[in-house]
Amino acid sequence: MVQWISPLDNSIVIASKVKILRNIKGIKFTKLLNEEEFNDLLSMVLGRLKEIDILDKCYVVKLKDGEEKIIDYYKENFGLIKYFENKDNLIFIMNKNGEFNILLNEEEHIGIECTNSGLSLREVYSKVDNLDDLIEEKIHYSFDSELGYLTSNIKNLGTALRAKVFIHLPLLSSNNLIRIIKNALKEEGITLKSIYNSGNKDVGNIYEVSNIKTLGMSEKDILDSLISITNKLILREKNQRDNLSKDEYIELKDDILRSLGVLRNTYSIDRDEALKYLSYVRLGVELGIIEDLSLKSVNSAMIEIQPDMINNSSIKKRDIQSLKIERAKIIRNALNT
């Protein structure tokens, strides 16, 4: 089980994720490699990782040969399927305890990532950094004294560090404050975006807070900035909740319990409607209105009801009606246990 899916507490922060990208000195960028060059790269990297005893604790899976295993592993993660498009040579090195995973030949030669519960960016970064140091003892990275780590995408130059926090902001979203906050955060080098969308509309009220800048800032500066912004978002969301009038609270509680009733008894439901109700249910658990459910159950349901997740578990691609029926079944199983 990936560690973040079981929350540390009833925090509105779901998880923290850190990923660093590295290229190997003297080797062309991933997008420029032919099949033979990729195989040489793979052989070299796996050999070096074996020398530092990383592989003994991991599954090594090539996407085109082991997609089902990778999908199962990533059921506890966000934004999976786009990640997999046209990645025939993508290699996943997945820690058996879910502590980290290494990606070879994705955006860059090497990607190291870790995810954990709550607002835990420093702890997550420490794990990634320690692993990066071990690998760097055996592999020489592409590094420039002025530019930092060299990457094929100029947006990743410098630290090549991407830090993300996943956070539930239903009250800020319902009060139409998200757009204002998004614009303000851009000025501070931070992106706030919904992880689920329907056209131009945010759905599900789960947002990703992440850094834009990787050049001209240290890793510590990036993490400190993101933690500070996240704490401000938490405070603003809690203020919205605390300042509800008596009538507003009664209406919200009714919406929460109605949503739970719908989801526990629905036979067919589309994704956007399901995410809307699951957000209410999650809020109900966070506020203590719903006491017989865990956030783990809600987290799992939100991820497993996505169309690509449902289709992956089926021998053939489902039609729209079949998807809606299976989605309802997944939700009932998650919320009635």
From Swiss-Prot:
Residue ranges that the Swiss-Prot or TrEMBL entry lists as coiled coil: none
Pfam families xrefs: ATP-gua_Ptrans
Residues annotated to bind ATP: 15-19, 162-166, 193-198
Domain of life the protein comes from: Bacteria
Entry-linked SUPFAM superfamilies: Glutamine synthetase/guanido kinase
This protein's record includes keyword Kinase: yes
Reaction(s) this enzyme catalyzes, per UniProt: L-arginyl-[protein] + ATP = N(omega)-phospho-L-arginyl-[protein] + ADP + H(+)
GO MF entries: ATP binding; creatine kinase activity; protein kinase activity
GO-annotated biological processes: phosphocreatine biosynthetic process
CDD domains in alphabetical order: bacterial_phosphagen_kinase
All residue ranges annotated as the Phosphagen kinase C-terminal domain in the record: 12-240
EC number(s) from the headed UniProt entry: 2.7.14.1
One GO cellular component term noted in the UniProt record for this chain: extracellular space
InterPro entries for this protein: Arg_Kinase, ATP-guanido_PTrfase, ATP-guanido_PTrfase_cat, Gln_synth/guanido_kin_cat_dom
UniProt keyword list: ATP-binding, Kinase, Nucleotide-binding, Transferase
Membership in a protein family: Belongs to the ATP:guanido phosphotransferase family.
Function: Catalyzes the specific phosphorylation of arginine residues in proteins.
Official protein name in the record: Protein-arginine kinase
Species this chain originates from: Clostridium perfringens (strain ATCC 13124 / DSM 756 / JCM 1290 / NCIMB 6125 / NCTC 8237 / Type A)
